[in-house]
A protein has these predicted regions:
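P-loop NTPase motor domains
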Residues: 1-129, 139, 199-205
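Short, solvent-exposed amphipathic alpha-helical segments in soluble enzyme
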Residues: 75-79, 182-183, 217-218
Length: 225
């Protein structure tokens, strides 16, 4: 019920939804500071795994099974752990690996617009970390590589600091947005008709856009041909 004497009051239903969201988040098992010792569960602390990553290794974090709010928290924790590793901001006993810290760490994230949308608040800690990577990460050996369905949905400063852009097939509505004003009409029309495996590359070293073809897999992926 809204207070008639206070136009800025919040509905009780809104408070209830907010309370439910907070309770579901803070009471989730992801916040339990312990892990099972059962070897078949393979439970680890993500921050410990990031701090012990070595050159040439790949770490995959599947967050599809948790809520969107928790996905942001997990992603933010990984980003902070990577920066702690590169800056040496960790206790010596936390890194058990005897190998040197990798000179370069590449972070690949799917659907970056979920974590740094164009409508993101300026006070978002996660956005601040992502902006730090895109603006200064290259000099510190941290590279952000992302894939998303709609480039226009990403925060402006992140797009502005992107050195290489690769475009796949998209729809006419997306191509008509301001993000594609620099794209010649012939290439814009081409983006709506690209075949699977065909891409358009944009990089400052080239004077024009380039159409490239992703190599066909050299092995049998199974399924119908």
């Amino acid at each position: 019920i809204r207070d008639r004497n206070n136009a800025s009051s919040i509905l009780i239903q809104s408070w209830q939804r907010f309370r439910r969201l907070i309770n579901n988040s803070i009471n989730d098992d992801v916040f339990v500071n312990s892990r099972s010792m059962a070897t078949d569960l393979h439970q680890v602390h993500l921050s410990d795994e990031v701090l012990n990553i070595n050159g040439g290794e790949m770490m995959v974090v599947d967050i599809a099974g948790i809520t969107e709010q928790l996905q942001c928290l997990v992603f933010g924790d990984i980003i902070r752990s990577v920066y702690s590793l590169k800056h040496g901001d960790f206790d010596p006993d936390e890194r058990t690996s005897t190998k040197p810290v990798p000179k370069r760490i590449i972070i690949f994230v799917d659907e970056l617009n979920k974590y740094a949308p164009s409508t993101s608040s300026k006070n978002s800690p996660l956005l601040a970390n992502l902006l730090d990577i895109t603006e200064r990460g290259r000099s510190e050996g941290v590279v952000l590589f992302s894939a998303e369905q709609f480039r226009s949905a990403i925060h402006e400063r992140i797009k502005g600091n992107c050195g290489t852009n690769v475009y796949g097939r998209t729809n006419a509505i997306e191509v008509s947005r301001p993000d594609y004003k620099f794209v010649p009409t012939v290439y814009a029309n081409m983006m709506t008709r690209l075949k699977k495996g065909d891409l358009i590359l944009h990089h400052p070293v080239f004077k024009t856009l380039l159409k490239i073809q992703f190599p066909f897999p050299s092995y049998n992926q199974g399924g119908s041909k």
